[in-house]
Amino acid sequence: MGSEMCIRDSGKVAIKIHTGEKNGPNILPREMVMALQQHVPDSNLVETNTFYKGDRYTTAGHRETLKVNGWDFCTVDIMDEEGAVMLPVKGGKHFQEMSIAKNMLNYDSMIVLTHFKGHTMGGFGGSMKNIAIGNADGRIGKAMLHTSDPSNPWEYSQERFMENMAESAKATTDFFGKQIIYINVLRNMSVDCDCAGLAAAPPTTPDIGILASTDILAVDQASIDLVFALPDAAKHDLQERIESRRGLRQLSYMKELSMGNDQYELITICLLYTSDAADE
């Protein structure tokens, strides 16, 4: 999925990560994230608080989790610390606007750095899920996208949840326009999200590599295609999780919303990564 880097040479850059719960065994390596961040001028890691009550429900608890998990080598902006704003959802059938973390508007560009894996509700978590849930604020936006019934914020249908996520993500993609890039890291692919922390199921799918694109649909589609192309024994658990949750609706609905292209070309780039890279 070859494309030129779209991030501006000047301006503030948000690197959207997923904190995960404390001591999660499958989160992205600290050294990998540090190596990227240190090569992007004027960049911060960015996150938002959770909808469910846990260690990341409050900003104070979230910052403690960030410290435990090693995300303390640079500034981390909890983007909904100061509230939320409503951004338009162009072409949405469920939402006309979405409640997004207020501080996202302070950035000129975004790098969506995603640990691709399974997800209990969404089937899988790729770039779209990272910004759909991850840029919505913890109190209003996440409640909006988790429900099809406003009176019951945990009542949802699986297909509606996928569509809600895509529309939430579209608020972010429309805001940044061409100033956004997506990186999916296909390693330690448990069937569970990093929200599961130590309770996450051990990965049974082998590591594949890293995908990058300026097209959100292409990068998630390619990630799914690479997983589904694995031998049956290697892909079984993750594919079952994705299909049983109707996770592929994420892709088809992004296409309906004209968020990207599900046709792509894979261009292989061989890079040697070592833990020393962050020190260079």
Language-model features and meaning:
Residues S3, R8-K12, I17-M34, H39, ...:
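Extended, low-polarity segments enriched in aliphatic/aromatic residues
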